């Protein structure tokens, strides 16, 4: 990671704080709310990178600003209540760790700035108006790799030449999952393969979903890029190994947890990346 180049995703929230605010008493310090669909344990590395980026800007937690954290532990249905808690705290900005958290935050408030390091299809999903000018109160970064689904299919075929059946571990309650699944299914057909899906929407679903794919005798499994599946990367790697299912991922973090191979982005880098357009969220560009 090019740490010197990366500082914060806050889209100007920190940079725009007046100088006087930096020296105010603790009760007046700017408040950042971290909202995640994952677990605190899995998020620790991302939090560390964010705080390191803030330190590069000269902001230190507990001195110049305060943080509150809310984690859904992989249960997306907990996010609305957690978001309501966050909004009642009246933070200066909500840092939504993934698009599912950004959706929950957007439903809860139209005034508090919301920044996310992992937006996906945000325009098509109606979260922002455009990448150049998001509009509303949401901005962030879209860590999308052009041609990612095609590359995942390519890797699947390299792992097992002649692959005929590709399993998809999906998470349909995450807004960005269905478009991924549809694209992968279409691409599988173009190479003469069949795609079989098994849905996991809470951590307890993962073992059963992988068992279902094993029962379908899939040759390889592609794990979709969602918050819950990412935070469950260790469980997925363990279960896939036990069922002898080769797996392809879109996030490097899956491989660090024991997965086979990934092609995609390093989310920890994106979490502390500099956002070049640092005005208010309605004007800030997504990058």
Descriptions of predicted regions:
Residues 1-287:
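Short hydrophobic alpha-helices and adjacent helix-cap/hinge residues
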């Amino acid at each position: 990671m090019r740490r010197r180049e990366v500082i914060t995703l806050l889209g100007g929230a920190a940079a725009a704080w007046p100088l006087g605010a930096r020296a105010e008493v603790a009760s007046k310090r700017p408040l950042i709310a971290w909202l995640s669909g994952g677990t605190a344990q899995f998020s620790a590395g991302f939090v560390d990178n964010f705080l390191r980026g803030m330190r590069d800007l000269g902001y230190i937690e507990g001195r110049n600003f305060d943080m509150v954290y809310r984690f859904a532990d992989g249960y997306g249905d907990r996010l609305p209540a957690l978001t309501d808690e966050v909004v009642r705290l009246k933070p200066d900005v909500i840092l939504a760790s993934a698009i599912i958290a950004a959706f929950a935050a957007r439903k809860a408030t139209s005034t508090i700035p919301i920044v996310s390091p992992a937006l996906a299809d945000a325009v098509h999903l109606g979260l922002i108006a455009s990448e150049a000018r998001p509009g509303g109160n949401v901005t962030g970064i879209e860590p999308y790799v052009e041609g990612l689904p095609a590359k995942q299919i390519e890797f699947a075929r390299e792992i097992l030449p002649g692959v005929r059946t590709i399993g998809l571990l999906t998470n349909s309650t995450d807004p960005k999952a269905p478009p991924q699944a549809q694209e992968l299914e279409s691409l599988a057909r173009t190479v003469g393969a069949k795609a079989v899906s098994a849905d996991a929407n809470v951590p307890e679903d993962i073992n059963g979903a992988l068992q279902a794919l094993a029962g379908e005798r899939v040759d390889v499994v592609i794990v979709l890029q969602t918050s819950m599946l990412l935070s469950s990367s260790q469980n997925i790697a363990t279960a896939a190994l036990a069922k002898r299912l080769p797996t392809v991922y879109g996030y490097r973090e899956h491989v660090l947890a024991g997965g086979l191979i990934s092609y995609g982005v390093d989310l920890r880098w994106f979490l502390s990346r500099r956002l070049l357009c640092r005005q208010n969220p309605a004007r800030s560009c997504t990058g």
